[in-house]
Amino acid sequence: MDNKQHNTSMISLLQYLFSILVILVHSGRLFSQDVIHFTFKSFLGRMAVPYFLICTAFFLRGRIQQGLCNHSYFRKLIKKYSMWTIIYLPYGYFFFESLNIAKIYLLPGFIVAFLYLGMSHTLWYIPAVILGWVIIQGLLKYVGTRGTFITVVVLYCIGAVETYSVFIQSTKFYPLMSTYMSIFQTTRNGLFYTPVYLLAGYLLYDYFNTDLFTKSRGL
């Protein structure tokens, strides 16, 4: 992609609309009609996080191509994340208290929450983005684009088992998945979920001006 300025107003508009959809996804039933409810909550709403991830990687890749360092971006992101973590500390404390765990495990619990799950279920996204970005940068460096693509797709497919676990209940893989879930709670994280979308945004920037996206194709 070249360095000329591009109009990003549509991207911003979609980000705003998807932000609203994220709120709706975490709300109760939206519509009485099953089809409409599914369309908004389970279809359109579930597109929000992938969209944000792809946009993030797209612009981070652009900064790299322009010779800019992304360290400042991630420093600012970590500062904001730390601020929101502090705000949610009381919530996290009462959550751990509700689990009736020994006080000795509170500090390790807070550390795990900060580095992995987020102090609130709304904060998981930031550590997942950071870890996912580190993973694809490392993979691209050592195994190249093709190897990275294969790896992140395999990781994503493994992570998808959380959603479709009913299909593996009679297999030997199910006990392994159950053990993983009992420890790590979810596959919606920086290892299994975010890398594939971050790589998509990364490659989208690289191929944005190729015939794949610019050449009109008649149906």
What function would you assign to each model-found segment?
Residues V49-R63, Y125-Q137, K172-L212:
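Specific transmembrane alpha-helix
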Residues M1-I168, T214-G218:
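Membrane-cytosol interface segments of multi-pass membrane proteins
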